[in-house]
Structure formats: C-alpha cells, structure tokens
C-alpha cells in the first residue's frame, strides 16, 4: 500500500481522490487513456475501456506507459488481471493495417498471420475481401474501406489506416491573424489531426474548437464540407471563418432548411442531411457532389446514424471530428473511432483553465431528498422511471429558486432535460425558456440578449448544447 490518489479496481474503474495532493498530476497522467464517468465533490470515477485504450495507442501511448502510470499513482496493489488485460487490449491495435496498393487498390496487411487467419474466417469479413496475396496480405475491395474497419473493430482487431487520402479540389485558405493569435493547444490539435490524416480532436466547451477546424482547413487548402448541429451553429461557424481566415462571403455557403448553397466551403446542418423525402435521404449526396478535400464533423458525439453509413463510403477524404466528449448516448463510439478516426488530440479542461484561456469553473454538488409522496411513487415505479422521479423532484425546484435568488443580477443558465419541469421553472422564475420547439429567430434573439446582459437568466433544454 502507498499513499497514492488512485484506487484501481478489477472491474476497470479508477477512483481518484481529488483532495489528494497528487490528484491534479494523476488526473493529467490518466487522461489520455481513462474516460471520466462521474465527478462529484470528493471522488471522481474513471473507467478503462477498449476504445479508450485504443485511442491512447493511436496517440502514441503504449501499454507499458499505461501500466506504469496505474502502478505509480495507485493507493493499493493494482489487480494483476487488469494489468494483463490492458497489455493484451492495447497490443491488438495496429496488428492489422490497411494500405494502398498499385495493383489491388487496397490491401490488409498483418504482422501476425494468426490474426489474419482469424479475421478472414469471420462471416461478416469475407464479403469485403478480395484475393489472398501472401500469408501476411489479402486484398480488400476499395469500396469497403469503411465497412471493413467497422467490422474489424467489432471483432476486437482495430486496423490502422495507412491507405492515404485524395487531396480534393484545391482552394486557398489561410488564417488571418491580424488582431488575434492562435493558441498553442489549438495549433497542436490541428497539427496532430493533420499528421494523423483523420480523427477526432477533443476540447472542452469554450476552448475554440472552431479555430482548430479553421487551422485544419488552412493545412488542407482545399474545398471543405462542415457538418454542424443546427442553423445557429452554421452561422456561428460562418462568422468565425470570415473573421479568422482569408475566406470571403462568396466562398462560404449554407446548406440548411433555409438555404441550399454549395460553395468551396459549405456548412450543412445534420437536420437537413438526415431529412427524408419519399423514404430517401435526399441530401446525403452532398458528400459526393463536390470534390471535398476535408470534411469536418462538429459535435461529432451527436452525429446522426445515417451520416455514419454514408461516411463509410468516403474514407478517402480527410475527416476531422470536433467534440467536448467522445461519449454518445446511443453507444456508437466505435463508429466514430472506425469511420471518423481515433482521438488525435485531447487536453483536460483544467489545463486550459490554468492557462487562463477559459473561465475558471467551480463545481458544487447539492444533494436533495424526495418528498414523502415522491418516495412512495419512486418505490413502486418501474426501474426505467425512477431516474425521472429523482430528476424532477419538487425539492430540486425549491433549491433552484433559492440559488437564482441568491445570485440575482448575475448571468444565470438553468439547464435541464425534462421539458415539463423546465416549463414549470420558467413560469415560476419568470424568465424565458429555450427548448426544441422554440423558433430559430427567437432562440437567436434570446441568446443575443443573454450575451449582452439584457436577459440575466435563461432556462434551457439540451438544445442549448447544440
């Protein structure tokens, strides 16, 4: 036993004692390979996952580094079975490689013939393959580049993709750093993506992911398709690109419900891309309608499933995913890894906060109790309904009212998930509410009023995160 800040458990959870003198150092050390699940006041819970370990491997970390880190900071002996599992899992990444071939177009190459024998016997892999070239190499149908990466990941053998990319149609784009300067971590993020070819950059909210996208575009110097969550985000991207790059208004198009402009830089919304007409996704051909050199997926953790299917067919295009989290509600993190690419850059928000680039955040957990009536309902409710009882308890509303009153005059956002609860809070507090059915112009007006201080308190649903 040592006096480390970390408790490593055999179920792959890591418990970090945030009050320990080495907690910040430990947090920074485990961030490349462990995923934060919960961060209450005293103990933060992280988890080791296959994808997290493979992302770390893709970023250049090896199993020895991960194991040494766990042992160094662990308060108790690290379970041997977990150490073996970490080493075995990380060794799986890169044993298979996709490469371009002048004769066959695309080939799958291995450093371990046993692994290749295993995967070519898999029923879902066989239709994607061509002729066996030698004991270490087999041809892959070029049109199945995305599909085979998905299938190999599901088998537990994530392939490294070295097959290269098309340049796309050239278009001059440069950063215009006259009255601003790119931050060091933004530059590192763009360079990390570019050297990796395709992949995901993870940065906290407010850290300037749009600037990373602009820097990637300056690297590519090619036509670019940018996919965003909604029209507000599209217009924010447009404003930032006009301000930060040499692009002018005629070079940037908006492809949304309101407009259908295709320009050298086109910003499209997920909503319009996934809109069906007569049962067909009528707008997905935008991916193929232009010789894009770069495709940027903003808030990639929200990427709709239909776009994954089309992304599988455009693996020869450079793809950049931007997000504050790799966790998806639908559990499709593996699709992001295989089709967009592995994590190329990640920096903890605490580091950026310490450098003064984002406002300091003080997180405080306030625990509340259910009322007697709610306790009875909770006890008899179905398991899937119990979370809602806790989330919408009347006691929580009382606490919100007290907090808003205590911070009167400050800029306050009240964020929630359940619309009926938010409707009630909006009415009780006498403040505006932004939710899914709030018209676009009204959203923009309220956000603008909040930014200027005209409105000091807003109640918002999850749409505020889009």
Regions found by a protein language model. Name each.
Residues 256-294, 305-310:
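Conserved helix/coil segment N-terminal to the catalytic DExD/H
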Residues 293-294, 299-364:
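Post-DEXD/H (motif II) to motif III coupling segment of the RecA-like Helicase ATP-binding lobe
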Residues 167-202:
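Conserved pre-motif I regulatory segment
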Residues 1-169:
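Extended alpha-helical interface modules used as scaffolds for assembling large macromolecular complexes
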Residues 195-217:
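Walker A/P-loop
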Residues 251-254, 260, 413-415, 420-424, ...:
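Conserved helicase ATPase core of P-loop NTP-dependent helicases/translocases
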């Amino acid at each position: 036993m040592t006096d480390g800040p970390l408790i490593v458990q055999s179920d792959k959870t890591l418990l970090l004692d945030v009050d320990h003198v080495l907690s910040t150092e430990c947090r920074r050390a485990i961030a490349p390979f462990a995923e934060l699940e919960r961060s209450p006041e005293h103990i933060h819970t992280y988890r080791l996952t296959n994808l997290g370990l493979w992302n770390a491997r893709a970023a250049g970390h090896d199993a020895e580094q991960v194991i040494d880190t766990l042992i160094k900071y662990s308060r108790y002996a690290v379970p041997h079975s977990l150490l073996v599992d970490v080493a075995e899992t990380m060794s799986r990444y890169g044993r298979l490689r996709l490469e371009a071939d002048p004769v066959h177009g695309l080939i799958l190459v291995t450093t371990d013939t046993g692994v290749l024998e295993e995967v070519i016997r898999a029923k879902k892999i066989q239709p994607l393959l061509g002729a066996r070239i030698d004991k270490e190499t087999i041809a892959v149908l070029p049109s199945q580049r995305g599909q085979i990466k998905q299938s190999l990941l599901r088998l537990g053998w994530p392939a490294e993709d070295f097959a290269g990319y098309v340049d796309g149609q050239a278009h001059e784009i440069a950063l215009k750093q006259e009255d601003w300067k790119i931050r060091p971590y933004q530059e590192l993020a763009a360079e990390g993506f570019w050297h990796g070819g395709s992949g995901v950059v993870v940065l906290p909210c407010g850290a300037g992911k749009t600037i990373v996208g602009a820097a990637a575009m300056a690297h590519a110097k090619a036509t670019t398709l940018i996919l965003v969550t909604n029209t507000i985000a599209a217009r924010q991207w447009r404003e930032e690109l006009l301000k930060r790059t040499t692009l002018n208004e005629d070079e940037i198009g908006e492809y949304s419900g309101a407009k259908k402009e295709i320009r050298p830089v086109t910003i499209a919304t997920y909503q319009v891309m996934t809109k069906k007409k007569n049962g067909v996704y009528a707008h997905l051909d935008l991916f193929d309608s232009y010789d894009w050199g770069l495709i940027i997926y903003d808030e990639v953790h929200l990427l709709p499933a239909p776009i994954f299917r089309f992304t599988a067919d455009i693996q020869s295009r450079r793809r950049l995913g931007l997000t504050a989290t790799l966790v998806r509600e639908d559990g499709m993190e593996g699709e992001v890894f295989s089709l967009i690419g592995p994590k190329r850059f990640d920096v903890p928000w605490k580091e950026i906060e310490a450098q003064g680039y984002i406002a300091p955040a003080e997180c405080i957990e306030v625990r509340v109790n259910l009322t007697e009536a709610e306790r009875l309902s909770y006890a008899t409710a179905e398991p899937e309904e119990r979370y809602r009882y806790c989330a919408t308890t009347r006691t929580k509303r009382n606490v919100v009212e007290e907090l808003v009153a205590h911070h009167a005059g400050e800029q306050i956002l009240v964020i929630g998930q359940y619309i009926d609860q938010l409707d009630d809070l909006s009415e009780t507090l006498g403040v505006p509410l932004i939710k899914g059915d709030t018209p676009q112009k009204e959203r923009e007006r309220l956000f603008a009023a909040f930014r200027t201080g005209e409105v000091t308190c807003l109640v918002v649903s999850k749409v505020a995160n889009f």
